[in-house]
């Protein structure tokens, strides 16, 4: 958008005024914007109408189908403004990747289990609506703001795909000639092998996200290769040769149980979401945790605020060396598409 016009001149649907850019991705740029009629802040995604692979219209249609679900951002408007496709939606808080960095790249078991419960619920809702997400990763889960600050939102449906007919419930056919869609770090083994993705792949990807939060890194991160294709092959090989037991070593048995279950699902099989939620809920109770929405970052932010109010300089922006994530991250700040790790 730089060089085309100034931000202050850009008004969407006669009432949404762009304030500042807060992100960008493969689709274009994201701005915090304000509804000039009531002062409400929203997020706006802009995509050039000359984009080689436009996805914003498709994403807006998926969002429309998902509207009303818990943890699904509300869509305010979609249309074109000047030379841009525009999606106006809820403004959300930081992503789980942002918060993971804020917490020095390690979450406590309590936080992981509280997140797992919400994450399984979000993915189940998308599946009930006949879609698979195909890019489950920490960047695509955002916390809400204000009264929704403890609610987890699932975003970025540019790679989502309808896996069954909404009327006949006929499942898409099994295929083995697919390119990897999504993010290699969290991709299922079958996705690496070129097998058409289905519900099982979203659930397996979530298992890798949870172990990433537990461990801090995954064994297939940081692999070096000359080309993207070779890197994907290395990640795939490492993933296939790392046993579930080794990946989850030192963590409760529920995590290898989760991954073994999801890897064992048939192509068109519906995951038993309640079984998976119960795995983690029972573990949560066994560990004597309280589901009080006190996440790791809640504690850190409270400490930062206390330090600030007590007059300690320099503590309002960082804690443990990480920038305090603030509200004002849009629904959809994470770039879509395939990424190398």
From Swiss-Prot:
Protein residues bound to ATP: 22-30, 45
Stretches assigned to the Protein kinase domain: 16-284
Its EC number(s): 2.7.11.1
Location of the active site: 135 (proton acceptor)
One Pfam family per UniProt: Pkinase
Disordered, as annotated region: 306-341
Biased composition (Polar residues): 306-320
Top-level taxon: Eukaryota
Single annotated GO MF: ATP binding
Gene Ontology CC annotations of this record: centrosome; cytoplasm; nucleus
InterPro entries the record matches: CK1_Ser-Thr_kinase (IPR050235), Kinase-like_dom_sf (IPR011009), Prot_kinase_dom (IPR000719), Protein_kinase_ATP_BS (IPR017441), Ser/Thr_kinase_AS (IPR008271)
Any one GO biological process: Wnt signaling pathway, regulating spindle positioning
PROSITE patterns the record matches: PROTEIN_KINASE_ATP, PROTEIN_KINASE_DOM, PROTEIN_KINASE_ST
Catalytic reaction(s) noted: L-seryl-[protein] + ATP = O-phospho-L-seryl-[protein] + ADP + H(+); L-threonyl-[protein] + ATP = O-phospho-L-threonyl-[protein] + ADP + H(+)
Biased composition (Low complexity): 321-341
Keywords annotated in UniProt: ATP-binding, Kinase, Nucleotide-binding, Serine/threonine-protein kinase, Transferase
UniProt similarity note: Belongs to the protein kinase superfamily. CK1 Ser/Thr protein kinase family. Casein kinase I subfamily.
Name of protein: Casein kinase I isoform alpha
Organism: Caenorhabditis elegans
